[in-house]
């Protein structure tokens, strides 16, 4: 029998790549803590009608891309295709709105969509998202955009562009929808098949088409900003002014509509250079009606989600180097030396050091070669002599400097070892 392969559209994330994921996760976690956002963890599957009602039945996500199945209780269940609907469901069900003020939440985890796999696009993908629920103030819009901008900067992401638009209120959007359909109907036969299908079902998505001919037609379409009511225009003007005050550059893009029906007012995307058609790494906006449409009280909200696969692909392409340094690699030969080495390694780990012990039982020469390849800063060496004397040889791998230390003293040299390891890390990075 042949071996079982990973399912199409999914992939293994191997240790050499995991360090990039850990880097992104740790950076985001620290930044979001500083911004007073609290982590929320929701199930990866929900009742299907949550997404049908929340995202919109006319969207491509609901119509074409969801993983939906009947469970053993004959209930329709869907693997979550995005994080906002589940976060809002949790906000309502657990009565977080009763706590008053703005609920600043964030989440991280896998999402699932049946899409054509490609670079930076998988059927199981991962997102970091934020949701600020309870404020219609334009400052909330500016805050979440500023956090996304700061995260990209903190990660060292080069060359990104912020695109900005407003979808106005539901009333503004309906007026614009009618004008857009009237305009696009003149060119129906020239639109690509997907856009022809969307003309009556979800015409705003035509503005986001990647088809060259359709894009050309969309460029001359009515501008949604011309259909904003007074309140919507004032809100959007204030968001723009706040971003200018924050020194966050942006460009207006009236064709930016996002793919989910729940958006109102501000919509935005961060696009990166070097990712081709998968350039959008972060997208979001305001969704003032979603909470009430899912059965909760009227609650204005704004948020975004970052696609981790695309972000990590960019970090790798930019050759941003991350080192997951190991403090010690331990080699030993002989039953007594190996037993003592096991105890030494455990004691060092309990004192906060990272230690890998060679378990091969091979000759010292082969073990030392593995130590040099391990990326460790220092090597601990125990043979018969060291086992008899209760000592250990400590070799600094970058310099070759070696010293003999009593095992009992090694346990009491935590601060000195830490200082030497810090110095060794500095030398190895230069």
Swiss-Prot record:
Biological process, per Gene Ontology: histidyl-tRNA aminoacylation
PROSITE patterns named among the record's database cross-references: AA_TRNA_LIGASE_II (PS50862)
Signal peptide range in chain numbering: none
Subcellular location: Cytoplasm
EC nos: 6.1.1.21
Catalytic activity as recorded in UniProt: tRNA(His) + L-histidine + ATP = L-histidyl-tRNA(His) + AMP + diphosphate + H(+)
GO MF term list: ATP binding; histidine-tRNA ligase activity
Domain of life: Bacteria
One Gene Ontology term, aspect cellular component: cytoplasm
Entries under InterPro entries matching the protein: aa-tRNA-synth_II (IPR006195), aa-tRNA-synth_II/BPL/LPL (IPR045864), Anticodon-bd (IPR004154), Anticodon-bd_dom_sf (IPR036621), His-tRNA-ligase (IPR015807), HisRS-like_core (IPR041715), HisRS/HisZ (IPR004516), HisRS_anticodon (IPR033656)
Keywords, alphabetical: Aminoacyl-tRNA synthetase, ATP-binding, Cytoplasm, Ligase, Nucleotide-binding, Protein biosynthesis
Subunit text: Homodimer.
Family: Belongs to the class-II aminoacyl-tRNA synthetase family.
UniProt-listed NCBIfam families: hisS
HAMAP family: His_tRNA_synth
Stated name of the protein: Histidine--tRNA ligase
Source species of the chain: Acaryochloris marina (strain MBIC 11017)
Lineage, broadest ranks: Bacteria, Bacillati, Cyanobacteriota, Cyanophyceae, Acaryochloridales
Gene name, Swiss-Prot/TrEMBL: hisS
